[in-house]
Amino acid sequence: MKKICLLLTIVAGSIICTPASAQVRVNINIGSQPVWGPVGYDHVDYYYLPDIETYYYVPTRQFVYFNNGRWIYSSSLPYRYRNYDLNRGYKVVVNQPRAYQNYSLHRTEYSRYRNYGGRQMIIRNSNDPRYYVVKGHPKYYNRGRD
C-alpha cells in the first residue's frame, strides 16, 4: 500500500508541477537600421528628421510624412525632398509607438538640429564591428543571414 501511495504522489506531483520557464525578450535591431542612421543605438523604432519634418520607421523601412491632412507611409521621400542628403542630415531617435502623433512636440523640441550639416556619426562611417552586419556598410558581412 505504501508503494501505491508513493507512486500516486509522484505521478500527481509530476502532473501538477510544471517546469519554470523564464522568457527574456531582448529586441536588438542593429542589422535593420539604415547605414545613414546614427551610431550608438541597439534598438530604434523611428528616426525624426528635423530638416524635412519627416519620420523614418525602421521596422518597415518607410518614411512617414504629413501630406494633405494625413500621415503617409512611403518607401521613398516625397518628391519635394528628392535632393535631401540622409547622410548629412541630423537624425533623432524616437522609441515610441506611432511617434508621428507627437509631431508638434518633436518639431519644437528638435528644431535646433535643423541644418546641423553632417556633425553626427553615422553607421556607414563607423569602425565599430557591431555595425558590420548592416547591409550597405563598407565592411558588411552577413553571417549567413542573406
Regions found by a protein language model. Give the residues of each.
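Low-complexity segments
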Residues: V24-D146
